Regions:
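Active-site cradle of extracellular carbohydrate-active enzymes
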Residues: 186-200, 204-261, 274, 278-281
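Extended ligand-binding groove/face enriched in aromatic
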Residues: 93-194
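Cleavable N-terminal signal peptides of Sec/SRP-targeted secreted and luminal proteins
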Residues: 3-21, 437-443
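CBM-like carbohydrate-recognition segments
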Residues: 22-75, 79-118, 122, 130, ...
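Short coil/turn linking the two alpha-helices of tandem helical-hairpin repeats
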Residues: 80, 131-135, 197-201, 261-266, ...
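Short coil/turn connectors between adjacent alpha-helices in alpha-solenoid helical repeat scaffolds
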Residues: 84-87, 134-144, 200-204
Length: 449
């Protein structure tokens, strides 16, 4: 399915000399928007072709997993919010609504086999982004409500049976990774809680953000100097940590910390944390200051998932700089270098665009350029998010409360309220349990067919 006619068209264009690197002047808003448009149109063209063949809104084809589709639509939501170009809004809205699942929490039954907590939260974060930029309201419910549903289902899964807490990577026992408590799932729940606190002013979200962050430091997923490690096995009571580091995890923790810094009016605790994360991000910068995926980029061994991580990272770093000016200068230097490198390693011709993974000369030659349709959706998404991240300083978080929401509340106990003040022993937990049971039955039935 990835071998498309568009690839052949682009190959012909390249051979005849009409393709060129994407033109980008990082000091020109018009140039940034124009470059972003080229990349967004390449992603949407691939999506449209997929939709015409498969007729399932919200999905990209194999080998892309469900979570990356959520990432793609989050990037397109941002594209609308940052450029004010609404051309793709109807597609975005249809995709998000189609992937909600029966209970409006981004748990579609047909994704049960690949549905982890981090996968679900990618879509929840996209829905919250839709709320922030005021994407036209869905047919029923609201983008904010859908994001809250994700939060409520995930906090009901907070597991104190091992490691004194934490969120497992996988939701269902039959999926590989069920006993792994990882930075991706816990970091994205931390970020979701911090963003909901920012958007609603509800202190329960801030309490949960504190609780999650404190737990990650206690088990060693986040080190004392703010390095973020991949995960730990709860069958060993989280006594051994996998120390591999990824850009996306680091940046999402950075964004969450920046939001807590904002909510606490620059408290010393969150000042130290957010500046620590930015200092530790030097792990991921190459020659010239551009972002690199240090664990796999230089040796050319990034897999299909890992090749999309840098886009997540530049997005979160850009948002962190917006709400925590204390770290803005350092982050903007990295974003500028990354955007330049991304534009340089993408070429466009006609309706086609190809991108490679590398933005830094220190890792050049470790990946090939290709279109989204020919296997490089992650690379094109990375470039889009790197370039449009330059626009974050020009916009405000729409609907943000910007107020203090008690982010330093104690977490020695367990915040028990949901976003609406109800106890988790009530409807929130019951609904989440129903989700899990229904989807497990659906998956078991599917296996028996």
């Amino acid at each position: 399915m990835l071998a498309r006619s568009g690839v052949l068209s682009l190959a012909f264009t390249l051979l005849t000399g009409h393709a060129a690197a994407i033109d980008l002047d990082i000091n020109s808003k018009d140039s940034i928007k124009s470059a972003a448009k080229v990349l967004a149109s390449g992603i949407v063209a691939f999506y449209d072709e997929t939709l015409n063949e498969d007729l399932i809104p919200g999905l990209f084809p194999h080998p892309y997993y469900w979570w990356e589709s959520g990432l793609a639509f989050n990037a397109l939501v941002d594209y609308y919010g940052l450029t004010n170009d609404s051309e793709y809004n109807s597609r975005i809205s249809e995709a998000l609504q189609h992937q909600l699942g029966d209970y409006d929490a981004f748990m579609p039954a047909n994704q049960t086999k690949v549905l982890g907590n981090d996968d679900q939260s990618f879509w929840g974060l996209a829905s919250l982004s839709a709320h922030e930029v005021q994407l036209p309201a869905p047919a029923s419910g609201s983008w904010l409500e859908f994001a809250k549903n994700v939060f409520d289902t995930q906090t009901s899964r907070w597991d104190t049976h091992s490691c004194d807490g934490g969120l497992k990577w996988q939701i269902f026992t039959f999926n590989d990774g069920y006993n792994y408590k990882n930075a991706a799932s816990n970091g994205q729940l931390f970020l979701l809680a911090a963003r909901l606190a920012d958007q609603t002013g509800n202190a329960t979200y801030a309490e949960w953000a504190n609780k999650i962050y404190n737990w990650t430091t206690e088990v060693g997923l986040v080190s004392a100097d703010q390095h973020v490690y991949d995960g730990t096995d709860d069958r060993q009571n989280c006594s051994a940590v996998n120390h591999i580091q990824w850009t996306n995890n680091h940046a999402e923790f950075t964004e969450g910390a920046a939001l807590m810094y904002k909510a606490s009016n620059g408290s010393q605790k969150w000042t130290d944390i957010v500046t620590g994360f930015v200092k530790a991000s030097s792990t991921f910068t190459g020659d010239g200051g551009a972002l690199i995926e240090a664990a796999c980029e230089k040796n050319g061994k990034c897999d299909i998932d890992q090749r999309a991580f840098k886009g997540i990272a530049v997005r979160s770093f850009g948002r962190a700089a917006q709400v925590a000016p204390i770290v803005a200068d350092s982050i903007h230097a990295m974003l500028n270098a990354s955007a330049k490198g991304a534009a340089k390693n993408c070429e466009s011709g006609g309706d086609n665009v190809v991108c490679g993974l590398s933005w830094s000369s220190s890792s050049n030659g470790t990946s090939e350029q290709a279109t989204a349709a020919d296997g490089n959706l992650g690379e094109v998404l990375n470039a889009l998010q790197a370039i449009q991240a330059l626009l974050w300083p020009t916009v405000k978080f729409i609907n943000s409360t910007i107020g203090t929401v008690s982010p330093n509340a104690t977490t020695s106990g367990s915040p028990t309220g949901t976003s609406d003040g109800a106890q988790h022993t009530g409807s929130g937990a019951t609904l989440a349990a129903s989700f899990t049971l229904v989807l497990a039955i659906a998956f078991t039935t599917a296996l028996s067919c």
